[in-house]
Swiss-Prot record:
This is 3-dehydroquinate dehydratase. The gene is aroQ. It comes from the Bacteria. The active site is at Y23 (proton acceptor), H100 (proton donor). InterPro entries: DHquinase_II, DHquinase_II_CS, DHquinase_II_sf. Substrate binds at N74, H80, D87, L101, S102, R111. The lineage of its organism: Bacteria, Pseudomonadati, Pseudomonadota, Gammaproteobacteria, Pasteurellales.
C-alpha cells in the first residue's frame, strides 16, 4: 500500500475556531478523518501531521524519505517565509502538492508569494476544505 502524507502548518490546529469566515467551520480532525476514509477506499494509506513549529515540520519531511510516496502540504504562514521547509522538500525529492484553504492571491500582499509553488506539482487555493479532497485525488492519480 502506498503512503501519502498530509502536512499542515501553524495554526491549522485551530480550524473551526479561527476566522471561520476565511477558513470555514470544519476542524482539522474532521478533514483528516474524511480524507483517510477516501484514501483507504482507494487502497492508499494517509498519514497526517500538523505542527506549529518549523523544526517539527522539517523533521517530519526528513522522516518521510523512503517511506512516503506523495506529500500534500498546507504550509500555512510558512508558505511566505520558510526557505528551510522548501529545502527539506527538495532534499527528500518526494512529489508534493501545495494546498491553501483561502485564496492567498486575493489576500494581503505579503501572502501572495509562496516559497513552494515553483517546486510543487501544483497549487490548490481558495476552495476551502474541499481543496484537500482535490489534492488527495491528484496525489492518488499521480501514484497510479
Amino acid at each position: 500500500m502506498q503512503n501519502i502524507l498530509l502536512l499542515n502548518g501553524p495554526n491549522l490546529n485551530m480550524l473551526g475556531k479561527r476566522e471561520p469566515h476565511i477558513y470555514g467551520d470544519q476542524t482539522l480532525l474532521e478533514i483528516e478523518q474524511r480524507l483517510k476514509q477516501q484514501a483507504i477506499k482507494q487502497g492508499y494509506n494517509l498519514l497526517c501531521f500538523q505542527a506549529n513549529g518549523e523544526e517539527a515540520i522539517i523533521n517530519r519531511i526528513h522522516q518521510a524519505f523512503g517511506n512516503i510516496d506523495f506529500i500534500i502540504i498546507n504550509p500555512a504562514a510558512f508558505t511566505h517565509t520558510s526557505i528551510a521547509i522548501r529545502d527539506a522538500l527538495l532534499a527528500v525529492a518526494i512529489p508534493f502538492i501545495e494546498v491553501h484553504l483561502s485564496n492567498i492571491c486575493s489576500r494581503e500582499s505579503f501572502r501572495h508569494h509562496s516559497y513552494f509553488s515553483d517546486i510543487s506539482q501544483g497549487i490548490i487555493c481558495g476552495l476551502g476544505p474541499k481543496g484537500y479532497d482535490y489534492a488527495l485525488d491528484f496525489a492518488i492519480s499521480s501514484l497510479k
